[in-house]
Amino acid sequence: MTDTPQVLLAHHLKTLRLPTFLREYDKLARQCAAEGADHVRYLARLAELELIDRERRMVERRIRQARFPAVKSLDSFDFKAIPSLNKMLVLELARCEYIERRENVIALGNSGTGKTHIALGLGLAACQKGLSVGFITAAALVHELMEARDEKRLLRLQRQLAKYQLLIIDELGFVPLSKTGAELLFEVFSQRYERGSIMVTSNLPFDEWTEIFGSERLTGALLDRLTHHVHILEMNGESYRLNQSRKRQKSPKTPA
């Protein structure tokens, strides 16, 4: 039995990986017929729908691959709550040109001031620009590095980390590092120097980073590389999370 044209078309579109074509071609054909649009306009509109949907799927895939703990945008950040933060610089960074230049970003501030939110927002902006992003806490990264070293797959993990155009390392300084952990993390920073962008959030000022790495020599060498091409976001102030919690408590509740 010969397949109908509709069945053949569906097969061809699936083979060509054009799911939006397959889903929309019949409905759009009816619309174009009603509007008197010719076949060129019909195909152009169908191709545009496919491109829009493909870009959406690519962004979603990059977000999944980034392993964000949550998806947060800069639009939802209350910049007024952290007056020390340079909003114009953040918005400039959201254009992601610093990633093309392989520059770094460091967000410094006491706990709860929204550093992770800003990092997530800039990471999301990079995904939307078509860039590859990886997100991980410093403690988790060191754990993965040490585990990979013990299992003799450290080189493979280092190569995987090097593929990210932007590597976000969150919460540096929350947990002191062992000598081995500090050296492994230093290698990550060193390997990305002028090759790929790093974004770091930390609750400690630079002069206290020796407490993290345990060695003035190692800390000095790391800061020399990290701050050579860097944008620093100062985020000291009252807890951003506490302010947001207060606002939610004060907002009138919708009656049941």
Q: Could you say what each language-model-derived stretch is?
A:
Residues 1-11, 248-256:
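Intrinsically disordered, low-complexity and often Lys/Arg-enriched segments
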